Amino acid sequence: MAFLKKSLFLVLFLGLVSLSVCEEEKRENEDEEEQEDDEQSEEKRALWKTIIKGAGKMIGSLAKNLLGSQAQPESEQ
């Protein structure tokens, strides 16, 4: 009976250890995924910032050209 008890305790102990290791690996994987998500978010933010900046410059130059072309006929009259 004592042998059975020791065997049962050994099996339970090994099961808990393996469960603990699996949970630790799972946490590490989740942390890595979060870091990848953060990096992707930063890249998207930088991309949008660049796109908006470029669009702003284009709109500004377009408005300047339109206003400039409207001002020229008035000065000729």
From Swiss-Prot:
Disulfide bonds: none annotated. One of its GO terms (cellular component) is extracellular region. GO terms for biological process: defense response to bacterium. Keywords: Amphibian defense peptide, Antibiotic, Antimicrobial, Cleavage on pair of basic residues, Secreted, Signal. Residues 23-43, 76-77 form a propeptide. Residues 1-22 form the signal peptide. It is found in: Secreted. Transmembrane segments: none annotated. Expressed by the skin glands. Has antimicrobial activity. Exhibits a bactericidal activity towards several species of mollicutes, firmicutes and gracilicutes. This peptide is membranotropic and it efficiently depolarizes the plasma membrane. Belongs to the frog skin active peptide (FSAP) family. Dermaseptin subfamily. This is Dermaseptin-B9. It comes from Phyllomedusa bicolor (Two-colored leaf frog).
